[in-house]
Design a protein with these regions (language model features):
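Alpha-helical support elements that line or immediately flank enzyme active sites
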Residues: 55-89, 131-151, 219-287
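Phosphate/diphosphate-binding loops
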Residues: 135-136, 288-313
Length: 313
């Protein structure tokens, strides 16, 4: 509109500090013009020879795994390899996510109950059972669907109250379903006898689980860098937490592991939890090739962290 020139928009720093100035956010121009590359954009620009990953995921919420047959998937077009838990263990990994248990006085778990790839049991809908690496995402997804998983289905608990009921089956072997308890902090006891029954109300309330519904898919990629380090790029907003959470599980010492935060779209907190980091890291170590993994929206909704529901009485 002629109100400003291009030169007027350029930040001109005076002094040694930008505190209290109109310093322009470094990503502003790219975001406004649509030229800011996010993780899924970076995945499209990976070098020739990059393998695209897809997951074989659980279609039930709770089950014992009786067998995993990858034969058909391994013979499908474009497939380079199918990775299961036994491959992670053969590569020196524990195949366990480290939950970094805090407040151990209140916790009844050591934090190692979650596998990177399920091999004995399914704990939730969408649990990863195998990773397929192929020349295209389409080939990888088709082969992931061809992995045959024989299961013994177990009772599914679709809310916390059902899961902690006295007769509920244990979900994680050796870990009580109500695995964390903390003190109830409240004021002094009230003399309810002084209030007529007609004036007393008991309320049971519930706040639902809230998916973050981010538009950018959960995505990441990895490679072995020039120093020989396993390098994972993701939307992590807890890099300092996610490295120790996955290192032992994939068999990579911390000093040989690097996680880089991609330019991220909205995460709204869901990427405080690791989602794809261990899967990508394990694939890079085993395959020794650059890889990428991009979720679709169904996977975003069913297999990433959520704001937890709450029950109150």
């Amino acid at each position: 509109r002629g109100e400003m020139t291009k030169e007027d928009l350029v930040f001109k720093q005076t002094g040694d500090s930008i505190v209290g100035t109109n310093y322009i956010r470094p990503s502003a121009a790219q975001k406004v013009t649509g030229t800011w590359d996010f993780g899924a954009d970076d995945a499209l620009k990976m070098p020739e020879g990059t393998l695209r990953l897809a997951l074989t995921q659980a279609k039930v919420s709770h089950a014992n795994i009786l067998s995993i047959d990858t034969t058909e998937a391994e013979g499908m077009p474009g497939v380079f390899r199918v990775i299961t838990a036994k491959d992670i263990k053969a590569a020196g990994g524990t195949n366990k996510i480290n939950g970094l248990v805090m407040l151990p006085k209140h916790n009844k778990t050591d934090g190692f109950e979650r596998p990177v790839l399920c091999d004995e049991k399914i704990f939730q809908f969408g649990d990863a059972i195998a990773i397929v690496a192929a020349d295209t995402e389409e080939h990888a997804r088709a082969a992931a669907d061809a992995v045959k998983v024989e299961i013994e289905e177990l009772p599914a608990y679709m809310n916390a109250m059902d899961a902690i009921a006295p007769d509920a089956a244990e979900i994680h072997p050796g870990v009580p379903n109500a695995f964390f308890e903390t003190n109830c902090i409240k004021g002094p006891d009230f003399d309810w006898d002084s209030i007529p029954d007609s004036q007393q109300v008991e309320i049971e309330s519930y706040c639902s689980r809230q998916p973050h519904l981010h538009l950018e898919p959960d995505c990441g990629y990895g490679y072995i860098d020039e120093d020989g380090m396993i390098t994972v790029h993701s939307k992590s907003i807890g890099i300092h937490l996610h490295m120790p959470m996955i290192a032992d599980g994939i068999g990579v010492p911390m000093e040989n592991l690097r996680i880089v935060q991609n330019h991220a779209g909205g995460t709204f907190g869901y990427k405080f939890s690791p989602t794809n980091e261990a899967l990508i890291g394990a694939a890079v170590k085993i395959l020794e090739r650059p890889v990428s993994l991009v979720f679709n929206q169904f996977q975003n909704i069913t297999y990433t962290g959520k704001r937890s529901p709450a029950f109150m009485n």
